[in-house]
Amino acid sequence: MPGVYGATTCAVLAPHDLITGGTAYEFHGHTDVKELAMYIQDTITVRNWSFNLGIRGDLYNGLAIARQAEPRVGIAYNFKPTNTVFQVSYARTVETPFNENLVIASTGCSSPFLALLVPPLGVPCNLGPIVPGHCNEFHVGLQQAFGKYLVIDGEYIWKYTHNGYDFGVVGSTPITFPIEWTASKIPGYAVRLTVPNFHGLTAFVVMSGVAARFFLPQVAGLPIIPVGNEVFRIDHDEIFNQTTHLQYQPFKRGPWLSFNWRYDSGLVAGASPCSAPTATCFSSTPFADGGGANIPSGQVALVNTVSGLPLTADQEFQAGLTCNGKLAAPNPLGPALATCSAAGLASIYVQIPKPGTKNDDHNPQRIQPRNLFDIAVGHDNIFHGDRYKWSARLAVINLTDKEALYNFLSTFSGTHYVTPRAVTATVGFHF
């Protein structure tokens, strides 16, 4: 890439460019990881109180060494007059490094090839090896029964990790490796409402949300992001999702009808191109606007903002990217659009913040919200047999044939669409 990479960089990378007749790069590394865990735990019940007490000790020997005692305690109280259970718990845990390609992550900066290939342009490869961290995790919960027709379960979670782990990718390959951030804070909640059986009607509603916040700078592993002190979200983060399920069976031995509604506010889609002087938009934002892309001011480079590589036409098509109201890649076979005006960049499937509104922590790129509906009808014992039973079921998944993404260029799973409308008929014989 003339004007972007210098002669030294090209001299290191060119021998392994298979398009020009180069050879595959081979990495050889080895280490032994040994871990010993010892723990003791007991449950004590006193009237309406229940105590779960324990302590664990971990001895970790890998590329780094850690020794840590990990206390944990859980307390529950059953207030019988109102059928209420309160619970609270705390656990301290040692966070050991992921083993997948741990050697590459910890020693890769000593390889000139990896030190130039993986880090963003201009980011030095000088971080140390992955070391164990520790986590403080708190849970607060409530269970409330309203007679025999409604039960509510709720829980709130705080998880604070020092030296929080994530994964990076070697270029556009499927090779992943662990990385380490300064810290992470992951609060979240989960609520479930259940109607066991009310005159043939059963129902439940499950809802949850999680904030997966990670704190720069990266402190270990091959660098994958510019140096900074910001807070950003990874693609586990979703503000709200819920599933509502209703099933009605008017007669105990008769047919039933079910309905399912799923809503998702959208996962973070950090690989989507964007324009802002932030860590996650660095590779798609022009030099003049505080980024690292060699393009005119006011433009956006259509690149994977995690790897820095240009998006292919297929990837632009999958993301539903539009430029000034027109598809960036109408055909997944090409050609791909290289840049777009920052004001004109949008997407059918991804929420891309407009210029001046992007914030890695509070307004990141996200998958568009979606509603999905399923219905089913069936009979579990058509001929009312005792020993032998026949059943039948007809189900329609994604009733409205909604077209949407689950994620975009996720580190492990890539890009996935929701299942298109599908009709399934099943006949069963039970004996």
Explain the meaning of each model-derived region.
Residues 30-38, 57-61, 65-71, 90-94, ...:
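Transmembrane beta-barrel architecture of outer-membrane proteins
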Residues 78, 86, 115-180, 185, ...:
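Membrane-embedded beta-barrel scaffold of Gram-negative outer-membrane proteins
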Residues 262-353, 367-372, 379-431:
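C-terminal beta-signal and adjacent terminal beta-strands/loops
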Residues 45-50, 156-161, 177-274, 340:
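Gram-negative outer-membrane beta-barrel transporters
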Residues 1-85, 96-97, 120:
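Signature of Gram-negative outer-membrane beta-barrel scaffolds
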Residues 51-53, 71, 84-88, 152-154, ...:
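Transmembrane beta-strands of outer-membrane beta-barrel proteins
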Residues 45-48, 79-83, 149, 198-200, ...:
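Short loop/turn motifs that connect adjacent beta-strands in outer-membrane beta-barrel proteins
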Residues 53-57, 75, 88-92, 101, ...:
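Transmembrane beta-barrel strands of outer-membrane/channel proteins
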